[in-house]
């Protein structure tokens, strides 16, 4: 008889402000969600926190226009509101909170006559993997980004090629990178695929945590369940908004045809929103394919002349990442409920290092943390609570972590699990 092995307690993911201010990075690498200041975090704490919402009528009536779709209130501190298809939304207040407990808000906003000015710590306010690990040798560090977004973005006559480094920013202040790894190959698919955690991010050499593809862990103003157009999840450095994957009820933007088809930059225009971009899960270029607008050069690391033209997919071959996780059963779950799931493992695929004995000490599917973890043979049984506002209809990644004597062992399965709406 195989006796189920329970996982050891999850690592404490909170650190004192002294450590953060002096080191600007965390010794165990995992970044905390918005959780209590002491003790081991409770499961899914960030996933169940309320997301930003529409603004009440009184606040809207008192807001003053700045430029384009941007408005500001006279409150202290002021709210920056964005007009999204006729709705006024507060995109940033929820993400401005001091989630790393260093006394500095994640985001600080101001504006001038032409730009929204954003100071960002580049700090993800959702659960991440512990870095460094067997899939990535780098640590996550707090940043001091300063970005300028055009308040009234303008279309360009040419497509500007995406540089390396940050190309845009999610609502939480974490940056998007283009889909290529340092050597110039596709980082998301094929032989050159790199290890991303289940929130689709990882740190590079200087500690910048960033996304290469759709980060379902970023809170957006409205539920993104495939029943309507997706909400805004970030902005490109030309000032145009980046939306989630859905174009309309049951239709992903990547599958839209005729006049709604996405261009080479992953963007299109409609009467309500004007020109905007969409993320395209599972399809290159995943976030942006180029800048269709006039890019704000001060945001870019690259100096000098920028090239023209959209980027092209250069993926080839099969991924070299060990496919230790074979599947999750069942592969779907409805929102607003707690579920018992089984993560199936194949130890023969652990070619870089043997699969550790015992239960993993961390399992995460998209933004959802396992509340309990047990292992019986090659089956890892977990319980996961899916919050009512979870993103639905999009395949989520799963990663697991083992605490070992050396570097933490991590394994990943892409497109492993899907949240469904209640009546599917």
Predicted segments, located by residue:
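Long, compositionally biased interface segments
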Residues: 259-321
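Extracellular/lumenal glycan-associated surfaces
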Residues: 145, 149, 170-175, 205-218, ...
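Solvent-exposed N-terminal domain segments of exported/luminal and surface proteins
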Residues: 39-190
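N-terminal secretory signal peptides that target proteins for export/translocation
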Residues: 1-11
